[in-house]
Amino acid sequence: ITATATSGSGEGGFLGVDIASTNAADILGGKIKKTEAIINIDGDLTADNISVAANAENSFEKDSLTEVGGLVGKVTELGGGLIPFGELVTDNVKIGYAKLASNAEVNIGSGANLTATGNDTLAEANDDGLREGGALNISAISKLSAEVGAEVEGVEGAGQGKAAGSVTPAGGRTKTNSLSKVMPGAGVSVVETDNNASVTVAGKLNSNGDANVSAHALSEVEAEAGVATIDSTAGSQYVNAAVVVAKIDNTSRVVLNGATQVTGELNALAAAKNEVTTTATAETTKDSLVSTAINVTDAVSTADLTVGGNVTAGKMNIAADNTISNEIQAATQVGKSRFQTKSQMSGGTLNAILGTTSNRGKSAKVDKIGQYFSAGAAINIVDEANSAKVTVQKGAQLTATDSGVDDEGNAVATINISANNTIEDSFMSATSVVNNYATKRGTTSSGGTPSTGTGTQTAALASVGFLQADMDNSAQVVIEGSGDQGTGAPVIKGANVNINANSAFEYDRLGSMIDSLQKDYGDIVEKYQEVPGLLTAWTDALAKSGQYLSNPSVDGAMDVAEAFQNAVDSISVKYADTAMGVPEDLQTLMDDLLAFADVSNYTNFYTAASTAGGSVLGTTSGKEQAQVSLAGSININSIKNNAQVIVGKGADIEASVADGGSVTKGKLDISAAAKQHDVALNGKTKYFIPTISNTGGGATAIGGSVGVHDADVNSLVVVGEGASLVGSDVKLAAENDLQHTAITFGGGKAANQGITGMFAYMEGESNSIISVDDEASINAANKLALNANNDTTISNIIFDRTSAGNTAVGASIGVVDYKVNNIAAIVDNDSDAIRDENEEVKELVNLVNNQLSAEEKAQLGTKATVADEANGKGKITANAVEVNAKTSGIITGVSVAGVTAGASQPNNRGTKIPAQIAGAGSASVNEISGNTAALLEGVEVTTASTDGYVKVSASDDSMIGAYSGAAALKKKGRQASSGGFSATLAGAVAYNEVKTDVTAQIK
């Protein structure tokens, strides 16, 4: 039984509709391109093999849409009012828009009874993650693909004839992308998507072979907006903006509420995959008033699986898997010099400027403003929520009948319950560059064409890069507790049982670059062996790449970067311009290599803002300097990464299988693992080596970089009162793996005064917690082990370098404020923390409660009263009991500030040297608190043999260090001797405040 719905459009269409013959406002006013494939079954089906498949696919591909009056105001509304384009409709505005929905749905009603009598087995997963081949297959697959683009390009001699960037819309009318002197150029892309796949089973499923019940939501969204202007007309001024607004929702859901009987293997899966690429790029190469790019991306991806009925199978895999990758960028360029990187650039703060330009009759005023102000800004705002969740509801019973032993006699899991949320790759950036260069004596270029005659100064250069990224990532398995009457708790029984929650933010930024290089290298290795040194240049680099791929790490990435830098250096620029300039594939290879020169490719969160200026011909007149040069980059990240396994009150989980008249106990593993490896970089650098070009081109240069990095990474296993855990070996594990790196670089040069400040603040929590209530019952024929491990590495690195003709002040401040807790405990975790006298238990209860919702706390019985506890304590029976908590890692803060005043500035020649000040200061502060504890309290422990033991241990091997340095240098005139230097100011402070405890206790 199959339902298939497919919809797609290629270039030349707009939501599948000819824009020339359709009212655009109606389309944007609520019409939606949607595909639906729905199957409803509420009767009896019997066959050897049964396949029920709902497949929906919705795709849209569109490079760009020429502006239409009715679209502009509507897109402004959809973009949240960020850009008021309503009065700025010109030939330079393009809009790209797509609103897509796709839904694949299978509903097996309560009156349905599906029976597959065949004994076919499941195959390996295909590219969509679907396992076919079983006797019974029920699946829903929804695919959504959207490509939206809006590109505006101006040309030399704009407005004369057909422009190179012109388009021919449907209907054959040619519209030229001529750039009016004062009208803006704008590219706007808006995309809204809703992708859903779901399978709901309320009836009966029976299979004599294997069975698959799965939902797959696969979403891929790409939105780009770009504007680039080129004009040779002197005095022209532009406002340029690129805007992307993306709202993405991707959901996969499976519900098993009926009775399911499978002789073979049952695969129940909710799978979501979300790929997001959004880019806003604004670039002007000559006269420009302001260049702006804004990227606002909101993405949600969810995989959710619920079991509420009775499920019996030989073996069963019950999983929710969510996989995410994203590349979200904003960058802008103003001025003559070009800042070109592999990742496109974007920028934008337009609102304050458009009030002037919206009145078309004031072109003279706009032209005048353009002589005094050159600005660029990149704003990137990202909000993501990604989750994978499995819930075993009240009343559910899961039973696996397989022996749990493979053909070679090895133990295999017969019940696998897992929630996996994985950020495979993530890159978010905001970069802005503003340039002011003089082309000849008496002329300036304030981000544009020279204005001659008077040598008018550019009053201000302003460049801003702003990134705000909020990410909430979680993986959760919830085994619900009993109802209010103490009945209905879930029962899970199988020979070997694994219950796992894994939430991972992976660092593998170089993987795609290396793959691309190796592919292109292999394609041409035989064709161009005659190019001297070409093939041997990459030997070391490729070897380092192989080492990195086998064991990805931040340090490994740095090794690769250095190796490829050496390779690029060994192939001179001459090769790129000549030998490599002719064969296209060799140029592609060089592009692959140069990708390693882009520092952003090594980071997850990147901001940079810079201004630059001076004279191309080396002239020295102060008239060629901007009066004020401002550059600021702001990098704000808030990341939550949580992995949780919750075993509710009264839940019964038993690793055992009946074999004839006996019962064989197996292995019960319950674990939560949270992994966060990320790098945030703030400031303009190359290979993480600081340059001093963040601010410049002005008599006074002011620059600042601010990084605020908040990461909460938590792994939690909690077992409620009255729960029963049984197996030969019972293992509970919580694992935190945090490598959080923030790097802030900055500085600049100025003719007279230079002031820079770098500030980076890292805060958050890293908690690895196992909490078992003392009213739970655990029976392990061999060993009970609780292992909490927390490896937290925090690096906060700041470097500031400033030089100026007269006054230079630089400051670097770094603060690390983190709580690191690592606790493994069997205690009264449903007690009120106020009543408990044990500080460690109070802290434990608080930590657990802070991570759980009110509903989740209720599943554990955390609201018990004193009278309730008269029901008695739990009991642990095992040959060996181990409760271990181990904390490790390195927390480092490094800040360095250096300044030079009175350095040999060209405009100091022949002038009286004014008073000069050089001051540098740096501060590095670490405030670290937390507990490492292993607790066994208030529970009866019985060892099963005379050689049994109880071991409780806690250790903290972490290292914490703060390092700070400052240097100030003042030099008079152009003297090279030591006599040219005089007193300076410099100061450095390093401070550690550490409040950590280590406790191992049996009570």
Write out the residue ranges for each language-model feature.
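Low-complexity, glycine- and small/polar-enriched segments
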Residues: I1-K1003
